[in-house]
């Protein structure tokens, strides 16, 4: 694929997305595209399916029907490939309370296949970016909810994803 065609393809494409939980319809026939390099927000009332849609794009739940492409990768058929380019931050910071902040970030950097030297460098860079460098040795359980959310953002950035999916990023 030439560079020009690559830059005009949408970074995220959801086509006729439907997600059901039993008889409950969480998402009904949602279609949209997100251009490369843009910021896109899902806005709606509680229960509208925003989090469910984000989780489907992040490969965490499987839609009942429809197609999702992330950087032209079909996430339903190649979730492991898609996960390498997606950074997902949920709405509530699930951190490992007994880990230090830098260990928490390092754990995810390791899971994404970064070697030891690259992990150390990326963890420091992400902690600096999220203003947590001075908390690097603090146990996650000692952090405020807002700081836990920043630690989660650092973890989300550590593998340099080309797509960020942030659920309620400004909640704290």
Locations of regions flagged by a protein language model:
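A short, proline-enriched helix->beta-strand linker immediately N-terminal to the Walker B motif
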Residues: 158-162
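Catalytic Walker B motif of ABC-type/P-loop ATPase nucleotide-binding domains
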Residues: 164-167
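Hydrophobic anchor residue at the start of the ABC signature
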Residues: 153
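Conserved ABC transporter NBD signature motif
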Residues: 66-77, 81-82
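Walker A (P-loop) phosphate-binding loop of ABC-type ATPase nucleotide-binding domains
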Residues: 45-49
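Conserved ABC ATPase "signature" region
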Residues: 106, 110, 117-135
